[in-house]
Amino acid sequence: MLHAYTPPHRFLPYLSWTDIAALPDKANTVIVLPVGAIEQHGPHLPCAVDAIITAGVMGQALAALPAEVPAFGMPALVYGKSDEHIHFPGTLLVDGVTLLNTMIALGESVYRAGFRKWLIVNSHGGQPQVMEMAARELRIRHGDFTVLPHFVWRVSNVAGSFMTERERRLSMHAGHAETAILMALAPDTVHMERAVANYPPEFPKSLSTDGRPAAAWTARDFGDSGVIGDPFPATPAQGQAILDSLVASWVEGITDLHHLQWPARDEAPPRLA
C-alpha cells in the first residue's frame, strides 16, 4: 500500500480534502516528508536503500507518536539528485534544479493547505543543500512557515557504537550502518554473499580533519563496487538497535517541533534585484 511503513491514520493522502480542511490547529500540526533516492548501493544492497531508510524510520516514528501530537506523513519522495552514482545501472535521478523546484512546489502545497510546520527528512547525502535552498526560499516567501530540512541520521542514535574508528571516519555509502538497518527494515533485499569492503583514499588532515574526501567525487572514483565502507560486521540485531534509536529520537523531534514556536514575520519579502 502507498502508506508503506506509516500507519494509515497518520498518512495525509488517506484523508479527504474536507477532512484536511477541518483539521484543528493546523498551524502546529507537523507534516513529514521523507526524501530518499534510488541509486546503487553496491552489489549486496538494493538501489532503494535511501528511500527504504527514510520511509521506514519516519513511518515508525509516526506510528510511535503519542496520540495527542498532531502529525501526518506525506508519501516519500524517492527520486533524488544522485549524479555521483550515475555510472552504475539502477541509479534513477533528477537534476538539482528539478529537485529544488519540486521541493518548493510541494512546500507551497503544504502551506496552501493551511499547515505551517513542514519537516523534511532526507536520507541521501548528495542533496542536503537542495533541501536547505528550498526551505530558505519558502521561508522568504512565507514568514510564518517553519520549514525544517533535516537528515535522517543526524539525530541521536547508536550506529557509531558498533563501528570501527575507520568506519566512523570514512564510510559514506553501503557500509556498516546502512547494511545493518536494511537487515532490520528489508532483510530479503540484503545479500551478504555479494558484499565487498572498500574505502576511499584519505584526504590530507590540513584539508579534512577526519580524512574524509573533501574534493568533489563520484562513487566510481573509488572503485568498481560502488561501496564506500565495510558492510561485513553488520548484523540484524545491530540494525534493529540502530532503527529503534533513530525512531525514538525522531518521536522526540516531531513532538518538539509540534510545540516549537518559531519567530514569524508578516511583512512582504523584499524584491530581489
Provide a role label for each language-model segment.
Residues 1-117, 125-273:
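Extended, histidine- and acidic-residue-enriched regions that form the cofactor-binding/catalytic faces
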Residues 120:
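Conserved SAM-binding loop
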